[in-house]
Design a protein with these regions (language model features):
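Secretory-pathway/membrane protein signature
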Residues: 2-361
Length: 361
């Protein structure tokens, strides 16, 4: 991702983003396309204290650390052996769960400053036939630094090994609840969960429209041209996304997450409410009242990240990236040693409650 800026191209892009953030996707002529509007009136099923206690008891930061985070903390720039290893790890972890994830590997080639490179996004979907999907997304690639660091390896702990591990831990911890998605029920909307792990978020040399966001640009374009539900002539996979939740730069102590987009404010406020509820129940670690993660401030700067290709196509976005960025951003100090386990554990709990509430489980 690139830091916020307001000049030149960035300002023009920000205007386009703001316009896209305020407009729903265009509907087709088919009256059946009205289902694409259901996301705007969707209501969560608020969890009570007993259900929240159950979520907290199911998640395990130590298990996540050993089984998901550490295997990802390797050099994994696009096309590297580490990239292949991490991709296989992600697929294996989802395939071992009972919920029944369907795994797609979206592989393609793009020209980069180092010639043509192969990229592979990993998409895990529960019930692809469901009309609507809540999407959680992150990028699994690490930034390519070449030889400039005298043999040292950049592992991108916050950027974005931790978000990847958090998403895998969510799938594991909520495995029993997520199995209910396949059970037909008149009390639940036709709604499911999709996890997207992007390749090629980072620039190889210098951030530009042609050297960044390789995976998300490709997948957004592909989804926009893929009919959904299958056989539809009026709606596509992008219109099937209820909410696109992007996690990035997570893992440092005391992060501050502002609200980036007014059209998803109510979902940001759910995160605030969940954080406050867990705090009041004494379920968050090292979380004094003044250390609130989710702040009501509307962030008016620009952060270019994997959400941009989706936002520009009208997809509602909830961007979970702290501002300011962690001090270790794009340095060799972005390592396991500089992560804060309590913060990550707290955010796991908040995100897992949010997902269950959104899915009405």
């Amino acid at each position: 991702m690139r830091r916020e800026g307001m000049a030149g191209v960035a300002a023009r892009l920000l205007g386009a983003l703001c316009l896209a953030a305020c407009l729903p996707p265009a509907l087709g002529r088919d009256a059946g396309a009205q289902w694409t509007l259901e996301k705007y009136s969707h209501q969560p099923r608020i969890l009570g204290s007993d259900a929240i206690q159950k979520v907290v008891a199911s998640t395990d930061i130590s298990e996540m650390w050993e089984n998901d985070l550490r295997p990802i903390l390797i050099e994994r720039y696009p096309g590297s052996q580490g990239s292949y290893i991490v991709r296989q790890h992600i697929k294996h972890r989802l395939q071992t769960l009972k919920a029944g994830w369907e795994i797609e590997e979206d592989t393609f080639q793009r020209y980069t400053p180092y010639g043509y490179k192969t990229f592979s996004n990993v998409i895990g979907t529960l019930e692809p036939s469901a009309k609507r999907h809540l999407v959680l997304a992150c990028h699994y690639d690490s930034k390519f630094f070449g030889q400039q660091w005298q043999g040292r390896v950049f592992v991108g702990a916050t950027d974005s090994a931790v978000p990847c591990a958090m998403m895998l831990e969510l799938a594991r911890a909520l495995d029993n609840e997520l199995q209910l998605i396949k059970a037909s029920s008149t009390s639940r909307p036709d709604l499911s969960l999709q996890l997207i792990f992007f390749d090629g978020e980072e620039a190889f040399v210098r951030w530009s429209p042609s050297d960044s966001l390789y995976g998300s640009q490709h997948l957004a374009q592909k989804m926009a041209s893929t009919p959904h539900p299958p056989g539809s002539t009026t709606t596509n996979q992008l219109q099937g996304i209820d909410l696109f939740v992007l996690l990035d730069l997570i893992g440092a102590r005391n992060p501050v997450f502002p609200n980036y987009f007014p059209n998803t404010l109510r979902w940001f406020q759910r995160l605030q409410a969940i954080e406050q509820k867990l705090h009041n129940m004494s379920l968050l670690k090292n979380h004094p009242v003044q250390s609130q993660y989710f702040h009501s401030t509307l962030h008016r700067g620009l952060v270019e990240d994997d959400h941009v290709p989706f936002l520009l196509r009208g997809v509602p976005v909830l961007h979970l990236i702290p501002s300011p960025f962690p001090a270790v951003w794009h340095t060799m100090k972005d390592t396991e040693e500089n992560l804060d386990k309590a913060t990550i554990d707290n955010l796991n709990k908040i995100l897992q409650v949010f997902v269950l509430e959104y899915l009405n489980l």
